[in-house]
Structures are given as structure tokens and as C-alpha cells.
Amino acid sequence: MGQSSSAESFSHSYSPQQVHTLLSYACQRLITPVEAQTLRKKLNSTTVNEKAQLSRADLAQLLLLNDPPSSVVYKCLQKLGKFPFFGEENDSTITADELIVASMLISGRFKKLKLNTDYDKLIFRALATSKLDAVTEKSEQLPVSVKFGRGIENPEHLQMASRFVDWSSMSGFESVDTDGYFISRSEMVQLLALFLVIYSIPKRKRISMQTELSQKLDNDWRSFEAAGEQLTTFIRSSEKISYQDFSSALALLGPLVHYGFEFLVDVMLSDTTEHSDTTETKKGPDLEVTKSHLINSSTIALLAATFAGLGGKQAGISLTRQNLVKLYLGSESGFSIRSLESKVFKWHAPTILLVSGERLRTTIKRYETFDSEYPRFFRSSESPLKPWQQPNDKITYAVLVHEPWKVSNKKNFGDTNTTIIALEPRLDVFKGIASESIYFNTLGMGLGFGNSQPINKNTLKRYAPGSVSLTIEANLEFAVFRHISSQAGSGITSFATGVQPDISGQDYEDRFLITDLEVWGVGSSKELEEQKKQWDWEKKQAEARQSVNLRSMGEDRALLEMVGLVGNHGSGGSV
């Protein structure tokens, strides 16, 4: 007699290969008919359930990738394609059905099947290498019991049976083994660099996005690779990354990794012919960054990925080339607190301040005044540099300011969304934990983030740096970032200590000579349009006032000529 077709659940034993086939059929149903048709067209096949072999070059063409990131992605898909029985690491090809399984896993679509599988562990295993020279095959040959949500006539008809598998009850899926595995740091750099390239591409018509992907991989890879190097500093310093360290880093890097994999799957499954995509997000004016020394595509992507990882309102800030507005460039407008005020204070949306310079190696005369006004934490006998700090370091910090700027000579401003980010020489994040953490002082005390109000009375000038703070002196020439995690610090605490695992518990300072200072406005399309209208209105008002003044000047001159104070030739009259 055949199996009962009642609604009662039952189990059936399958070989590991049959279990993989069941999962393959289930994953194929997670892609839409249009996506399946597109993939068949790209693979030049009649069905996506084929054992046709794809080489690394084939996959690179399918995903629009080149070396070096294509090899990392290829190995990742190879291993996941054989899930739940991860493939051997020396496999040289991947089949079409394995590609679909891997794609549904890395994109997160597999969650619709209610698999009891940890996504982070899946990604780690896909990127990882085993310490062992070989993997025993005995465990892979054991039959697997598969539970069904209802009875079926023929459990050996795998395509039909796959529709009724209770994937949530599959034992072993939830326990992806991570012990004894590690990720090569160099491969992690390549993957993060690729995802930063993807993150830098604004959402619009697919064909435009994919064209930009190819262009940036060809032309801008080195700058994104350097940004990928910076991101890996969030992972404990080792050439071999364990799961524990990888998992900790995903707390901040998770959104970047997830979006990157989703984008690649979309590239694979989307039709980019001109007629296929009629919807397009309106593209704003492209950012002109040629004059900026601190902002480029890779920097924007790095900041955007960091904000996304922070969560909260920071994650809601969309950072692209299209929604950044140049407000102030010290190299263009001059390094003056008044110039900074005139350029920045009219902007009523979030801003990003970037300050960069060279580490102070010798005391110069102009610095001595600032040094005398800035309280020392370290004894003169202590070395001013930690092992990771070098005398010739370039130092760059960014500050996300969520509230509009204001003169604050008596009371600080700002909310808890204010965030300090160290960009160079090590990437780190210092989250705001208290409001009123910013001052903009026009009476000779500069800018402070995380400080109390400075003292400025008669002949006494004194800064009051917080335990985690960035201080910029009034001439915009010198700056100090202070990070005191010990109880010895006496300043206020407006920012949390860094998230870098290696140095978050240490006390240190970055003192530097400022070479560049820039402020960029961040806004949605609506905010940018409203701000433009406001600026246009202010410009017209200024022109109108100038016109009135010129007319008034003409009337005043005629009156002076009548009384003989001004002659026709412009010479003064006698009294």
C-alpha cells in the first residue's frame, strides 16, 4: 500500500544527496517566474534544475565581477551550494541548482522556508577554511530523517515531496559547525571592499546600477580596497578570523554584508535589458567632490555602512553622492571660525564635519598657547604614543551632528545621535550617550564635541575636555581627540568609549596639526529642495536690498550736490 495522503505528518529517510535535492527544489520556488526565466536566459538553458557546470569565469560574468573579489564570492557560493552538507574546498565548479541554493541562503530568502539555521554561521562557514587537511565522509553518508507536514503518496517523487517538507523540524540544520574554521583576513578585505563598492551605488534603474558597479570595480577598486582594510580593523587583529570575532564584528558590519549579498543575487536574477525596468528612482544632482580632500565614493560608502551598523536615527541617514551638499571647505573658504559659521549655520538638516591632519611630532610656537590651555592627562614622563600610533600618522575624524548648528558660548547643544567616527589611522566609533555635547564658541575657544563649556574669563582660558572628546581650537589649526576609559578621567562623559575590541579599554590621545576641515550637509531629496528654495529666496532678498541701497545712494548724492558738498567732478566742497 502507498503512503497515506491524510493531513497527519510523517517522516521518511533520505540520503544526503536526496536531502540536498529536496532543498534545491524548495529554493527554486523562492525565485519568481520572471527571475527563473532571466536565469535560464543567462545560463542558456531550458531549466534551472540542471547539473551544468559553471566555472569561476562563468560566475564572474553572471555577477559582473572581476578579480580579486570574484574568486572570494565564487568559493563562498561553491560551499553553500551543497548545503546542508558543505562541499569540499577543492571543488572547481558549481552547478545551476547549487547556485540557486547558495543564492537563496546568502540573500536571506531561505528564511521563508523556516529553516532553523543561523544566517551568520552560514556566511562564516561559506567564507571559512578548515584547519583540517581533510573532512571525513562517513557522517555525510548517513541517512537523514525528513519530517513532512502532511502525508504524501510518493515520498520518492522529490519535486512533489519538497512542497511538504517541514524544514523547521530538520535536526542538524541549526547547528552549523564553526569550530576549527577561520576566514582569511585578506579575503575578508576583498569581500568588504566589494560590498562598499555596492553600498556606494545609489538606488535607481538596475541597468544603471550594474553599469556603475562595473565602472567602479575597474576604476576605483584601490580606494575601496583601502576602505575595506579600514573596516577589518573592527575585527580582532589576526590573519585568521574566528567565528567569535566574525560574529562580534557583524554587530556593526551586518547591514553592509547582508545588503552586499542581496545586491549580488539581484544582479544574477534581474534582466537588465533596456525594456525590462521602467521604474527608476529619481536621481539627484551628482556630488561635485573634486575640490574635497576628505570625501570620495569610498569614504561615503564607509560612513554610510558605519551609520547603518549603529542603528537608531543614524541608520536612518541615507548617505550618497546625491544627498551630500558642500557647506564648508577650509581649503576653499579659509580656516576661520567666522567663515565656518557663515557657511554652516543656514543648514537645518544633519551635517558631517570632517577634520584631518598630521600627528604633532614637535612643539611649535603657536601650539604652545593651545597646549597650555588644554589640561594634560598623561604625565610628561609617559610616552605620548601607544603601539598602534605612529609619529607620521595621518589622522582623520568625522562627527555626525544631527541637530542644526548654533552659537553656544554659554550652553552646549546637540542630542544623543551625535557620533564621532575615527577614520584614520584606525576605524572606530564613539556613540553619543548624552545630549548637549557640542559647543561652537565664537569668543576664542573653538569647537568642542564631548566637552564641558570652556572657561574664558579675563586672562584665564581653559578647555574642559570630556573623557571621550574632540577639541578644535579657535584658529582651526590644532585638534585633540581624547579617549580615557579608566576611572582616572575627570571630564564629563558624553560619548561611549570606542568599539574597537583591541583598544576600547585603553587611554590615549591623538594630537594633530589640522590640514583639512570640511562640513557637508546631509538631506533627503525633499530637504535638499526646501533648502535650495530657502537659499534662492535669501539670495533674491540680498539682491533686492543691494538694489535699494544703490537707488538710495543716487538720491543721497543728488542732495549733497544741491548743498554744494559734492561737486560734479567728485571733489569735496569747501567749508
Curated annotation (Swiss-Prot):
Where can this protein be found?
Cytoplasm
Q: What sections of the protein cross the membrane?
A: none
Keywords, comma-separated and alphabetical: Cytoplasm
InterPro entries per the UniProt record, alphabetical: TLDc_dom
The domain of life is: Eukaryota
Keyword hit for NAD: no
Span of domain TLDc:
293-523
Keyword Cytoplasm: yes or no? yes
Record's Gene Ontology CC terms?
Answer: fungal-type vacuole membrane
A GO biological-process term: protein-containing complex disassembly
Q: What is its main location?
A: cytoplasm
Q: Belongs to which family?
A: Belongs to the RTC5 family.
Summarizing the function annotation, the protein's role is:
May be involved in a process influencing telomere capping.
The protein, known as: Restriction of telomere capping protein 5
> What is the protein's species of origin?
Meyerozyma guilliermondii (strain ATCC 6260 / CBS 566 / DSM 6381 / JCM 1539 / NBRC 10279 / NRRL Y-324)
Q: Print the organism lineage.
A: Eukaryota, Fungi, Dikarya, Ascomycota, Saccharomycotina
